[in-house]
A protein has these predicted regions:
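Cytosolic, long alpha-helical scaffolding segments
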Residues: 1-254
């Protein structure tokens, strides 16, 4: 039990022994590649860092989706789409590897608090991977639109940009919260952004029916458009699930 008080000190020592690699696009695990550590608490801390990195990289993946929307050159588009596809595949692997590590930790002797932590962290990992899936779904919709001979109207682009900004705000807030060790990040901000996303989706859904009927754009472009808007709303739901899992365990710890 004495070791618990020195977890932070041991953690710093381990980080010096196992230096962090430079960020790359391989989505390689950084903190739990060496197997289980001397205590369950220290192993959980390392898994926490891996989840934080997973969240950051998924946020970066969404940034690629935003870039893809305005990439017109076919060669550049294909390269960026392939990069997003690669991120999605490795995101799947990260979910499995982190979950397997946490399940190994849970096989040991754990306090009730540690068991709650692991349960919440497993939920976080699942939902972060779902965010990666949503990013890939967005990229696939943009790809279908890119392969067609049609384009969104300026008004549609404006609405997509606004929805993308709300989604990016949600992801930024999520990353800040999962990395927050001192409970200073306001959880309610995430819920407020989610409400904004839901309300905006409903507004655009109703407006889309009117715009298609008024022949401002054809039905198929309306489908691509609403697929993007709807997927952003789903992504926002996954973000809130991560936030809830992370904030619940931190409340129990404090």
């Amino acid at each position: 039990m004495i070791l618990i008080w020195f977890v932070k000190l041991i953690e710093k020592t381990v980080c010096k022994i196992i230096p962090q690699r430079e960020q790359d696009e391989e989505y390689r695990l950084r903190f739990i590649t060496g197997g289980m550590l001397s205590t369950a608490e220290l192993s959980i801390l390392q898994a926490r860092k891996e989840i934080n990195l997973f969240a950051e990289r998924t946020h970066r993946m969404f940034g690629m989706v935003r870039d893809l929307l305005h990439t017109t050159n076919d060669n550049d588009f294909n390269k960026l789409f392939s990069r997003i596809e690669k991120y999605e595949n490795i995101s799947d692997n990260m979910e499995v590897e982190i979950a397997n590590y946490l399940n190994q930790v849970s096989d040991g002797r754990l306090s009730s608090e540690s068991k709650l932590q692991i349960r919440a962290m497993l939920r976080e990992v699942t939902e972060i991977e779902s965010i990666g899936d949503s990013c890939y779904n967005l990229a696939r919709t943009i790809n279908r639109k890119h392969r067609s001979d049609m384009d969104f109207t300026p008004k549609q682009y404006d609405h997509i940009h606004q929805m993308f900004q709300l989604t990016d705000d949600a992801l930024s807030q999520m990353v800040s919260l999962v990395e927050d060790e001192h409970h200073v990040v306001d959880v309610n901000k995430s819920f407020n952004i989610e409400n904004e996303i839901n309300n905006y989706r409903n507004q655009l859904k109703n407006q889309n029916v009117l715009d298609v009927n008024n022949k401002e754009y054809d039905y198929q472009m309306g489908v691509h458009y609403m697929d993007i808007i709807g997927e952003c709303e789903k992504l926002g739901d996954y973000v809130v699930n991560v936030v809830e899992a992370s904030s619940n365990v931190k409340e129990k710890k404090s």
